[in-house]
Amino acid sequence: MVSFTKTFFAIVACALGVQAHGYVDTLNVGGTQYTGYLPYNDPYTTPAPQRIERPIPGNGPVTALTTIDVQCNGENGGGSSPAPLVATIAAGGKIAFHWTTWPSSHVGPVITYLGKVPSSTDVTKYSPTGSDVIWFKIDEGGYSNGKWAATDVLSAQNSTWTVTIPSSLAPGQYIVRHEIIALHQAQTYPGAQSYPDCFQIRVTGSGNKTPSGSYLVSFPGAYTATTPGIAFNVYTNFTSYPIPGPAVWTGN
C-alpha cells in the first residue's frame, strides 16, 4: 500500500509539472567558461549572441521521446539547429554543466552522450538525422543510496554536473548531449520528461579510439516506450533504477 506521504508527493509533483523546469545556462569546457544558449534572451538580442550550444525553445521538456526533438531539444519544433561556435578540449579534460534552478520534485537521472561528427563535415553545419547512429554515453547518474542524481546530487554540487572526456577518445568534432530525464510523471508512457542540451566541441590529443557496436545509438531511437527506466513509478517502494540508454563507454 502506497503511503500517504508518497501519495501527497505525487499530487504535488503533478501540480508542479507545468511550472519551472531548467536548462544549462553556463558551462566550463576544459577550463574555459561559456554561456549557454539563453532561450529567453538570445532570440531577442541583436546581433544574436554567438554560442557553442544549439538553440532550445525554453525550459520545458520533450515528452515525445521518439521524435527528433529528443536529440537536442527543438528550437521551433522539428529539431534544433547548429550553433556558430565550437569549444576546444583535450581528451581527458572535464566539462562542468551548470543548471538553472531545478525543481526538487523532478527526480531522475543525469546522462551525457557524445555524437561523433563525420570527418568531412563541419559541426557548425551538421544536423544528425534520426537514423544517424553516432551517439555514445560517457557519463550517467541515477538513483543510489536513496538519492537521485537530478535533484539530490545536482543540488549538493551547486547545480553543477561534471563529466570527463575519455582520455583515449580520437580527436575530432563532437556534439555533447547533456540531459536530465524527469520521472515525476513517468508512471506510464508518455510521461517521462527529457531536458536535452547540446554543445559543440573539438577534441584534441593523441587518442585513437571510438566506440562501436552496442555502445552506439541514434536520437530518436535510443528511447522507446518499453526502454527500461522510461516508464518508472517513483512513488512505489524501489531500491534501484535502470538508467535508460546504452552502457557507458569509458574509452577502453
UniProtKB/Swiss-Prot annotation:
Biotechnology note: Lignocellulose is the most abundant polymeric composite on Earth and is a recalcitrant but promising renewable substrate for industrial biotechnology applications. Together with cellobiose dehydrogenases (CDHs) an enzymatic system capable of oxidative cellulose cleavage is formed, which increases the efficiency of cellulases and put LPMOs at focus of biofuel research.
Textual note on the cofactor: Binds 1 copper ion per subunit.
Protein name (Swiss-Prot/TrEMBL): AA9 family lytic polysaccharide monooxygenase B
**Record: residues binding Cu(2+):** H21, H106, Y195
- Secretion signal: which residues? 1-20
Localization (cell):
Secreted
Enzyme class (EC, first level): oxidoreductase
Binding positions (O2): H184, Q193
Q: Which Pfam families match?
A: AA9 (PF03443)
Q: Does the keyword Glycoprotein apply?
A: yes
UniProt feature coiled coil, ranges: none
Task: Spell out the GO cellular component terms annotated for this protein, sorted alphabetically and separated by semicolons.
Answer: extracellular region
* Paired cysteines (S-S): C72-C198
What family does this chain come from, according to its entry?
A: Belongs to the polysaccharide monooxygenase AA9 family.
> What are the UniProt keywords, alphabetically?
Carbohydrate metabolism, Cellulose degradation, Copper, Disulfide bond, Glycoprotein, Metal-binding, Monooxygenase, Oxidoreductase, Polysaccharide degradation, Secreted, Signal
Q: Does the keyword Signal apply?
A: yes
Q: Main site of residence? A: secreted
| Annotated EC | 1.14.99.56
According to UniProt, the reaction catalysed is: [(1->4)-beta-D-glucosyl]n+m + reduced acceptor + O2 = 4-dehydro-beta-D-glucosyl-[(1->4)-beta-D-glucosyl]n-1 + [(1->4)-beta-D-glucosyl]m + acceptor + H2O
State the Gene Ontology terms under molecular function.
metal ion binding; monooxygenase activity
* Cofactor requirement: Cu(2+)
